[in-house]
Amino acid sequence: MSIRVGIVGISGFGGGEAMRLVASHPSFELIYAAGEGSAGSRLVDRFPGVPAKLADLVIEKWDPVTLPKLDLLFASLPTGASAEALARVPEDVRIVDIGGDHRYVEGWAYGLADVWPAEIEGRIRVANPGCFPAATLSALAPLLAERLIEPDNIVIDAKTGISGAGRGGADSKFGYAETNETVVPYGLLKHVHMPEIAKTIERLSGGSAAGLVFTPHLVPMTRGVLATMYCRGRASTGECLDAARRFYAGRAFVRVTDKPPQTKWATGSNLAFVSYAADPERNLVIAMGVVDNLGKGAAGQAVQNANLICGLPETAGLDGLPVWP
C-alpha cells in the first residue's frame, strides 16, 4: 500500500528535489503539492521533466484546513515560515520539516539520520538539519564522540553552491552576473546555522562549543557544500579515519575517504564524504565534510528521515549513484 505524500514549498529548490526523490520512491505516492508562487500551475509547468504520472498534478495554495488525507508531509519553506504554516496540520500526519524553524524544538526529533537514527524511528515530527550542519557534523561527530578533538576550539570554513541561497525570483541577488567568478563570505558571526552546529557539538561531546567560529562562503557552482574544520587535538590522521570508520560502520550514506573529498562526488545523491588530516605535534586536526546541499543537506536526508519514521528501509528511494561529471 502506497504512503500518501504531500510537499509544501514545492516551487523552490529543496521542494523540487523532494519531488524528484518522491516521484521515484517505491513506497511513496505524491498526491498533494503546494507552493505560494506557483499555485494554480500544473507540476509539469514548473518542472518540465516531471514523470508523466505527475504532470497534471495542480500546485495549490497552502491551506492546512483543505489538506487531502495524507500520511506524510514534506515542508520546504523559508526560515521563519514553517512554524506557523505547519501548526494546524493534523497530528496524525507525519511531517519532515526541511526548513529551520523546528530544529531543537520540543516535540520534534532532530533528524541527523546517520548519527541518531534510533531517535528518529517512529516519530511523527522530524526537523531536518541544515546543509552546513549536515556537512560539518558528519565529519565532526566521530571525533567528538571519541574525544579526539576539543569541542570549544573549532573553526569552520565552508563553501556552498548558489542553490543553497534558494530559487529566488527576477529580483534575486543571486543571478549569474552577481555570482559568477566571485566568492562571497556571508553571515559572519551570526549565520542561522551556527546555533544548531554549536548545540549539536555540545550534545556529541558533553562539552562547551562557546569558541566556535563559522564562516560560510558562496561560490560559483550550482550544488555542493565543502566544510573544512580546524580543530585542536592530538590524534593522528589514521586515528581520525579509524574513528570515523567505526562510527559509521554499517551506515549506508557516509563514506570515509583517505583523499580530501570533492563536492562533485556527492552531486545528486544523499551521500556524505568525510576525511581528515592531522598533525599531533602541532595539536591540529583538520576535518573535511562534503554533501550535496540539496541532497544530504536537504531533500535527500528528508527522505532518509521519512523512511525511518515510516518503518521503511533507510535506503528506499535513495540508492541512485551521484551524477558524474
From Swiss-Prot:
Q: Which residues form the active site?
A: C131
Show the catalytic activity. Answer: N-acetyl-L-glutamate 5-semialdehyde + phosphate + NADP(+) = N-acetyl-L-glutamyl 5-phosphate + NADPH + H(+)
Q: What is its EC number?
A: 1.2.1.38
Q: Where are the transmembrane segments?
A: none
- Enzyme superclass (EC): oxidoreductase
The record's annotation in CDD domains points to: AGPR_1_actinobacAGPR_like, AGPR_1_C
Q: Name one GO cellular component term.
A: cytoplasm
Subcellular location per the Swiss-Prot or TrEMBL entry: Cytoplasm
Question: According to the lineage, what is the superkingdom?
Answer: Bacteria
Which Gene3D superfamilies does this chain map to?
Dihydrodipicolinate Reductase, domain 2, NAD(P)-binding Rossmann-like Domain
Q: Which UniProt keywords apply?
A: Amino-acid biosynthesis, Arginine biosynthesis, Cytoplasm, NADP, Oxidoreductase
Transcription regulation keyword on record: no
Q: GO:BP terms for this protein? A: L-arginine biosynthetic process
Q: Where is the signal peptide?
A: none
Annotated GO MF terms: N-acetyl-gamma-glutamyl-phosphate reductase activity; NAD binding; NADP+ binding
Q: Which InterPro entries match?
A: AGPR_type-1 (IPR000706), NAD(P)-bd_dom_sf (IPR036291), NAGSA_dehydrogenase (IPR050085), Semialdehyde_DH_NAD-bd (IPR000534)
- Respond yes or no to whether keyword Oxidoreductase is given for this record: yes
Membership in a protein family: Belongs to the NAGSA dehydrogenase family. Type 1 subfamily.
Any idea what job this protein has?
Answer: Catalyzes the NADPH-dependent reduction of N-acetyl-5-glutamyl phosphate to yield N-acetyl-L-glutamate 5-semialdehyde.
Record NCBIfam families: argC (TIGR01850)
Q: Which HAMAP family match?
A: ArgC_type1 (MF_00150)
The protein, known as:
N-acetyl-gamma-glutamyl-phosphate reductase
